[in-house]
A protein has these predicted regions:
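Short runs within selected transmembrane alpha-helices of multi-pass transporters and secretion channels
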Residues: 6-7, 11, 31-57, 61-81, ...
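Residue-level signature of transmembrane alpha-helical entry/exit and packing/kink sites
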Residues: 28-32, 116, 120-124, 128, ...
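Membrane-proximal transmembrane or re-entrant/amphipathic helices at the cytosolic face
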Residues: 137-186
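Membrane-interface helix-boundary motifs at transmembrane edges
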Residues: 58, 109-118, 142-145
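Transmembrane helix-loop junction
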Residues: 18-19, 55, 82, 110, ...
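Membrane-interface helix termini and inter-helical loops of multi-pass transporters
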Residues: 14-26, 139-147
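Interhelical loop/hinge segments that connect adjacent transmembrane helices in multipass membrane
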Residues: 110-125, 173-184
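Selective transmembrane-helix segments that form parts of the transport pathway or gating/packing helices
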Residues: 1-3
Length: 186
């Protein structure tokens, strides 16, 4: 889901700023949006780690890893903002959450022999990248609301069809079944 949202946002953010006639200075923040998007993808990809750790007998590790995140993030943010400005803040966020989630990932892997990734994760990343590149190269020259809508429809369609065809997540089938029961079957 985070790849779906980020892909749609990143495909259309620049044109969205232009269509909404936002200040040109906001375009300088595009890479901040990209870096923060990557941080959210990492956090979402390892999102259940905190729930598993927090409800286990190792719940203290959840607290300590949060303290380590804070102790790592604050000085890193200060240093990077001081030297690189607003993009430094985004880089600090990405680095802090990457380290934080890696530590929790390793903890779960070692203590419980659990990890959230498999080959379908790789297929999801490849599918999203392919959908992004197709939309970017086919439709990037189309501006305005038309371009935004076309890119969003094509990107979303490629991902949704690919997710169902490749059976990348059982959640998608459950969501579809619930939708079908609620709206299509009477």
């Amino acid at each position: 889901m985070s790849l779906f949202i980020f892909g749609n946002v990143w495909l259309n953010v620049k044109q969205g700023m232009e269509v909404l006639h936002l200040q040109k200075e906001y375009l300088d923040g595009l890479y901040v949006i990209m870096i923060l998007g990557f941080a959210r993808i990492i956090d979402a990809g390892t999102g259940v780690n905190g729930l598993v750790i927090g409800t286990s007998t190792f719940w203290r590790f959840d607290f300590y890893s949060g303290v380590v995140l804070l102790a790592f993030r604050l000085p890193l943010t200060w240093y990077l903002v001081k030297n690189y400005g607003i993009i430094g803040s985004a880089i600090a966020e990405l680095a802090a959450y990457a380290v934080y989630n890696f530590v929790r990932f390793e903890f779960l892997r070692r203590k419980f022999n659990m990890q959230p990734f498999n080959k379908k994760t790789l297929f999801s990343i490849i599918l999203t990248t392919a959908a992004y590149l197709i939309c970017y190269f086919l439709l990037n020259s189309i501006g305005g609301w038309t371009g935004i809508i076309l890119r969003a429809i094509l990107f979303s369609s490629i991902l949704i069809i690919g997710i169902f065809y490749l059976q990348l997540t059982p959640d998608a089938n459950q969501l579809y079944d619930n939708f079908k029961k609620k709206y299509l079957v009477k």
